[in-house]
Structure formats: C-alpha cells, structure tokens
Amino acid sequence: MSNSRSVLAFDYGTKSIGVAIGQELTGTANPLAALKAKDGIPNWDDIGKILKEWQPDLVVVGLPLNLEGGELESITPRAKKFANRIHGRFGCVVELHDERLSTVEAKAELFEHGGYRALSKGNIDSQSAVVILESWFERQYG
C-alpha cells in the first residue's frame, strides 16, 4: 500500500457534516468548510464537488459509538448509510472509523487556538473530521 494517498474525512451529523483532507505521507489533515445537512441528508452535489476537487484515494467516515464501543441507535446507522451512499454514488473506497470523543478533542483544539470565537458549529464539525482522520492515520501507521 502506498503511503502517499490523499484521504478525505467526513464527520457525519444530522445538521452539519464536517470535512477534512489529509495526506498519508505526513499523517496530517486540514479542515475544509462544513456542509449543511437537512435531517441528515446532505446536498449530494456539494459532496460530489468536494470529491471532484480533491480526488481522494480513500474516504473515511466517522462512526459514532458510545463510550463502551456500542452503536448509538439514533445516529450510527445513519452514518453507515451515509458512507454506503458515498461509495454507491461516487464509487469511492470508504472506510468507517471510530469517532469517540472527536468532538471533545476538536473543541479543545479550537478553543486553544482561537478562544470562544473559534467554537462555531461548522468549525467544530470540520475540526472533528480532522481529529477523525488523524486518528485513522495513527491507527494505520502508529
């Protein structure tokens, strides 16, 4: 497996979907603008534009789990469906990755660098996507 692939990550939510892009070579990720969702349904044209612009080799979707590692009845199946739709609509290779505590970590990082003003919903969601993606890199390569 090449370690110079580009990877796009999504932090799925019912109102907002965080987005980040990263490189396996460096193991780092950067936030992109969060996408709006209406009751969990994104604008698929916006997803398509992001995929066309960044042309990732892989897409990682955060998998919401409870602290014990079990599925959350209200959101986990929807995140899985979102991942399956990305694969089905766009033919992307998609992996799910445990996103436990990613929002907590994202808020802490944003607050550290920008105080309360940095804690907007879109910033938090895309920073969560960064945390998910960097955690995925860490799991792959230690």
UniProtKB/Swiss-Prot annotation:
Keywords: Cytoplasm, Hydrolase, Nuclease, Ribosome biogenesis. Could be a nuclease involved in processing of the 5'-end of pre-16S rRNA. The keyword Hydrolase applies. The keyword Nuclease applies. It comes from Photobacterium profundum (strain SS9). SMART domains: YqgFc (SM00732). It is found in: Cytoplasm. It holds the Pfam family RuvX. GO terms for cellular component: cytosol. PANTHER family: POLYNUCLEOTIDYL TRANSFERASE, RIBONUCLEASE H-LIKE SUPERFAMILY PROTEIN (PTHR33317:SF4). GO terms for molecular function: nuclease activity. This is Putative pre-16S rRNA nuclease. One of its GO terms (biological process) is rRNA 5'-end processing. HAMAP family: Nuclease_YqgF. InterPro entries: RNaseH-like_sf, YqgF, YqgF/RNaseH-like_dom, YqgF/RNaseH-like_dom_sf. It is an enzyme of class 3 (hydrolase). NCBIfam families: RNAse_H_YqgF. Belongs to the YqgF nuclease family. Its EC number is 3.1.-.-.
